[in-house]
From Swiss-Prot:
Disulfide bonds: none annotated. The keyword Magnesium applies. Keywords: Hydrolase, Magnesium, Metal-binding, Nuclease, Toxin-antitoxin system. GO terms for molecular function: magnesium ion binding; RNA endonuclease activity. The keyword Nucleotide-binding does not apply. The lineage of its organism: Bacteria, Bacillati, Actinomycetota, Actinomycetes, Mycobacteriales. Mg(2+) binds at D8, D95. This is Ribonuclease VapC51. It comes from the Bacteria. Residues 5-120 form the PINc domain. Belongs to the PINc/VapC protein family. InterPro entries: PIN-like_dom_sf (IPR029060), PIN_dom (IPR002716), Type_II_TA_system_RNase (IPR050556), VapC_family (IPR022907). Pfam families: PIN. Gene3D superfamilies: 5'-nuclease.
């Protein structure tokens, strides 16, 4: 299967939850999911030491990597402007970059973060909750 989905950090950080794992595993096994470089940075930020950081990076390598580009940054700025026009400022910069990468590559952003509903409302891009909102936190 070709790439179809882009994982947000909100999904990756919840892979220990059975419902999230059940949703992601078949997609990962089919080679249908990717992650972005900003996601690697977000996940690596939580590492308490080098050993844990290395373990996290190895785990992330199970997903294809979408490299950050200048066009992602330009689009993230554009999305930020569209949100500001609606007085919906304050969306996290990593979310804007992930959304921009997903949009450019024609991928559905899989998330567990309401910010993506706001982003999708201005971009029209496909975003999907990995499990229904409010069911695991």
């Amino acid at each position: 299967m070709a790439l179809k989905y882009l994982l947000d950090t909100s999904v990756i950080k919840r892979l220990s939850r059975p419902a999230v794992r059940r949703a992601v595993e078949p997609l990962a096994e089919a080679g249908a999911v990717a992650r972005t470089q900003i996601t690697d940075l977000e996940v690596g930020y939580s590492a308490r030491n080098e050993t844990e950081w290395q373990r996290l990076m190895v785990a992330l390598s199970a997903f294809d990597l979408i490299e950050s580009t200048a066009s992602h940054h330009r689009r993230a700025l554009g999305i930020q402007r569209l949100l500001a026009a609606r007085s919906q400022r304050g969306r996290k910069i990593p979310d804007l970059l992930i959304a921009a990468a997903g949009e450019e590559h024609g991928l559905v952003v899989l998330h567990y973060d309401a910010d993506f509903d706001l982003i999708a409302a201005v971009t029209g891009q496909p975003c999907q909750w990995i499990v229904p909102a409010g069911t695991i936190d």
